[in-house]
């Protein structure tokens, strides 16, 4: 049986996993997404996470408001660069959107739903 080492000496701190030599109870083993609490029963530990309506609504809003304009901006960029004389203002706007705003959209796409009650 392999579990994560809890001691903080130098040898075991830098190792990813160490064999369990002490008697650690079953509830103290580290499980992904589960708090280390002895009062949890098994049926609550393995309960699947079902997103609530607020999480689904936020995902739909982010998809329609943020990603669809991104695809439109990329298609406008493709149209402008195939044209021989593109408008410099439109090229600047699409560059600003694709290079500066889009990374923040992707950042909040992954982090904001985690802060919702059901996320």
UniProtKB/Swiss-Prot annotation:
Domain of life: Eukaryota
Annotated membrane topology: Multi-pass membrane protein
Keyword rRNA-binding part of the UniProt annotation: no
Residue spans crossing the bilayer: 53-73, 92-112
UniProt keyword Membrane present: yes
Keywords on record: Membrane, Transmembrane, Transmembrane helix
Protein's name in the database: Uncharacterized protein IRC16
Record organism: Saccharomyces cerevisiae (strain ATCC 204508 / S288c) (Baker's yeast)
């Amino acid at each position: 049986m392999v579990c994560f080492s809890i001691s903080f000496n130098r040898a075991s701190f830098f190792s990813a996993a160490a064999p369990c030599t002490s008697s650690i109870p079953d509830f103290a083993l580290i499980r992904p997404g589960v708090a280390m609490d002895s009062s949890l029963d098994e049926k609550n530990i393995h309960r699947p996470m079902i997103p609530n309506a607020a999480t689904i609504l936020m995902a739909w809003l982010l998809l329609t408001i943020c990603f669809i304009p991104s695809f439109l901006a990329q298609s406008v960029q493709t149209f402008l660069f195939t044209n021989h004389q593109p408008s410099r203002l439109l090229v600047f706007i699409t560059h600003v959107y694709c290079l500066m705003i889009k990374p923040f959209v992707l950042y909040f796409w992954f982090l904001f739903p985690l802060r919702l009650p059901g996320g």
